[in-house]
């Protein structure tokens, strides 16, 4: 028989087995001893024996995913570090590059040029990388400024270069890579410069490390350069436009008649560069014949205009540049053979580059007549109808364009005054009768011959410039028949010249 104490212990053990999570129930007659007190809580020891393969594969996949993430982060950091180093090297190249500008003569305008930019020297065909002035820097330069102090100093030096190279009225500067001199060593009939300049247009994708050592700046012009000109490119985008001396009437004529991008490019080339300039120049300014470089700003303007008007691609622009260089080579060969370099389309029409303005400032468009086609192709022709001022462009022996104005005090109603400038620089003033339909009724009659007087005068209270000419006449001579026009030119010239005298710096006809 069990004793009472043993029986109580057995019952206590049975109760504990039934309620493992609860405190043991102590019987009333059970005496609590030290052995009955529960030991202090200890960390449960669990023996891990993972024999399930699914748990192992799950843990392995988690480990593999974490490793892949870490590898991806590491590769991105390496790419970022390489990009920062590349940008730092480019900034160092820009900072250390010292380009001495070479003056490139450019005669621009219609028909034989309207401006001469000797003081605006820029480099070759630009690309899409643009750095604005200090107020609007590119985000890449701004980020680099916050990275290291050395890059900060490089950026400040670059900004100083921009400010020193750009006059106060200019705002945008383009960073351009230029082909090295050793890149162009073919003869002139084969090298066009377009291959090198095409590399410039795509220098962001180029892997040639030698191209990175030739960097220069191109300064975009503003409306102040050519107040009477027009924009090439998108006039609403200051980074994709160039101010040109082409007038609005000429630009309308070009846009109307040029249906393809290549034809428009070659037409704009004739308006912007005289054939004499084309003959001694090309796009790259390199070659064995010592050719000069076409004004890269105007070439960039042509590029912007074609991209804006025709949505051309870089491959199209590469082909057009080859055509431009081919046109320059053709002009060079014609000059070597002694052939004429005149633009036929310009000699058959009245140039709209001349400014026709009335006293109220209204511009009038004058249509060309058949008489203008019969005159010498060496002379510049201007027709004036119901206006009081005509602008004269004359190209000097040095290639400079001299601009003057011819002031006429009064024009008889229903008549036109045709001003012809001969090869010697003298002005021949003719009277032309024009019908209501715009047709010339009778041939032009020479009424005066005048030369420019550098002395200043006054016309209606406005001072004359140095190259201005004032012609006053009270009564015009009777108009001769068309058949007798040629015979009447010389007698009229000799008869009218004694009646001309200079008074207060102006040439007057009595």
Swiss-Prot record:
Pfam families: BEN. Residues 348-359 have a biased composition (Low complexity). GO terms for molecular function: DNA binding. GO terms for cellular component: nucleus. Residues 178-212, 343-371 are annotated as: Disordered. It is found in: Nucleus. Keywords: Cell cycle, Chromatin regulator, Coiled coil, DNA-binding, Nucleus, Repressor, Transcription, Transcription regulation. Its main location: nucleus. Residues 193-212, 360-371 have a biased composition (Polar residues). Residues 68-100 form a coiled coil. One of its GO terms (biological process) is chromatin organization. Residues 239-335 form the BEN domain. Belongs to the BANP/SMAR1 family. DNA-binding protein which may repress cyclin D1 transcription by recruiting HDAC1 to its promoter, thereby diminishing H3K9ac, H3S10ph and H4K8ac levels. Promotes activation, which causes cell cycle arrest. This is Protein BANP.
């Amino acid at each position: 028989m069990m004793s009472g104490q043993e029986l109580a212990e057995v019952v206590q053990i049975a109760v504990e087995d039934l309620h493992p999570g609860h405190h043991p129930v102590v019987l009333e007659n059970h005496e609590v001893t030290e052995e009955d007190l529960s030991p202090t809580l200890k960390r449960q020891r669990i023996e891990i024996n993972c024999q399930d393969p699914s748990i192992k594969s799950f843990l392995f996949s988690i480990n593999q995913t974490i490793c892949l993430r870490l590898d991806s982060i590491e590769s991105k950091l390496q790419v970022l570090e390489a990009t920062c180093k590349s940008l730092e090297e480019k900034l160092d190249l820009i900072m250390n590059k010292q380009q001495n500008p070479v003056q490139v003569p450019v005669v621009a305008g219609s028909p034989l040029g309207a401006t001469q930019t000797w003081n605006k020297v820029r480099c070759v065909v630009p690309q899409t990388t643009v750095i604005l002035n200090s107020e609007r820097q590119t985000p890449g330069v701004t980020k680099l400024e916050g990275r290291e102090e050395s890059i900060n100093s490089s950026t400040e030096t670059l900004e100083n270069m921009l400010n020193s190279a750009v006059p106060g009225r200019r705002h945008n500067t383009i960073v351009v890579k230029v082909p090295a001199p050793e890149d162009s060593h073919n003869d002139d009939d084969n090298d066009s410069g377009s291959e090198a300049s095409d590399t410039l247009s795509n220098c962001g994708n180029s892997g040639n490390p030698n191209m990175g050592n030739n960097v220069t700046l191109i300064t975009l012009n503003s409306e102040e350069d050519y107040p009477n000109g027009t924009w090439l490119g998108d006039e609403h985008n200051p980074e994709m436009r160039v101010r040109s001396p082409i007038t609005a009437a000429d630009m309308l004529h070009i846009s109307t008649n040029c249906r393809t991008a290549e034809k428009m490019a070659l037409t704009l080339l004739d308006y912007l560069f005289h054939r004499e300039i084309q003959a001694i120049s090309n796009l790259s300014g390199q070659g064995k014949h010592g050719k000069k470089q076409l004004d890269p700003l105007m070439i960039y303007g042509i590029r912007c205009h074609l991209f804006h008007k025709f949505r051309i691609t870089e491959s199209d622009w590469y082909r057009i540049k080859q055509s431009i260089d081919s046109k320059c080579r053709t002009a060079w060969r014609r000059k070597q053979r002694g052939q004429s370099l005149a633009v036929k389309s310009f000699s058959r029409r009245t140039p709209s580059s001349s400014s026709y303005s009335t006293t109220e400032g209204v511009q009038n468009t004058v249509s060309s007549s058949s008489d203008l086609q019969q005159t010498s192709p060496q002379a510049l022709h201007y027709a004036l109808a119901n206006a009081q001022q005509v602008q004269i462009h004359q190209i000097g022996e040095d290639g400079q364009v001299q601009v003057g104005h011819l002031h006429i005090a009064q024009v008889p109603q229903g008549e036109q005054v045709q001003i012809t400038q001969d090869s010697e620089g003298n002005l021949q003033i003719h009277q032309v009768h024009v019908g209501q339909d715009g047709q010339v009724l009778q041939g032009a009659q020479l009424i005066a011959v005048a030369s420019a007087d550098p002395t200043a005068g006054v016309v209606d209270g406005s001072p004359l410039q140095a190259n201005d000419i004032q012609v006053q006449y009270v009564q015009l001579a009777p108009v001769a028949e068309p058949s007798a026009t040629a015979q009447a030119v010389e007698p009229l010239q000799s008869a009218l010249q004694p009646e001309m005298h200079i008074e207060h710096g102006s040439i007057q006809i009595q």
